[in-house]
Structures are given as structure tokens and as C-alpha cells.
Amino acid sequence: MLNVKEAIQDMGGADVVARLIPGATKNIVYHWSSANRVGPRFYLRFLELCSKMKVKVDPAKVMNGDKND
């Protein structure tokens, strides 16, 4: 399973993810990548996008971040 940063890269980068998630800007996606988590506002949309693009992520790590990093 990928972390948030790896998932964003796997889906084509911040530009692509920002275009595919309504309401998300490139800056927001860059923040997700650096924080390695997605906030509650876009959490479900991010998981849906990962599912559509067949990118496997751990939902708990998407919401809370990877505590080991």
C-alpha cells in the first residue's frame, strides 16, 4: 500500500490530482504530499480517486498520516 505522497505521484502528480478532485487546488495537493495526509474535507474524494485509478492506499494513513515517517 502506498502513502499519500506516493499515491499522488502514481496518479500523475499534483496537477493531475488537483484537476480530478473538485475544489482541490494544486497548492492543497502539494500540502497533502508534504504532510503525507489528506484532511477531512477531501478525504472521501481522494479515496474515490485512488479507487478509480487503481492505486492502493491505507485509508487510516490517508487520514492520519504515517506516524513512522
Regions found by a protein language model. Name each.
Residues 2-7, 15-16, 26-31, 40-44, ...:
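Short, charged recognition helix plus adjacent turn
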Residues 19:
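Alpha-helical residues within the helix-turn-helix
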Residues 22, 34:
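Residue-level detection of the helix-turn-helix DNA-binding "recognition helix"
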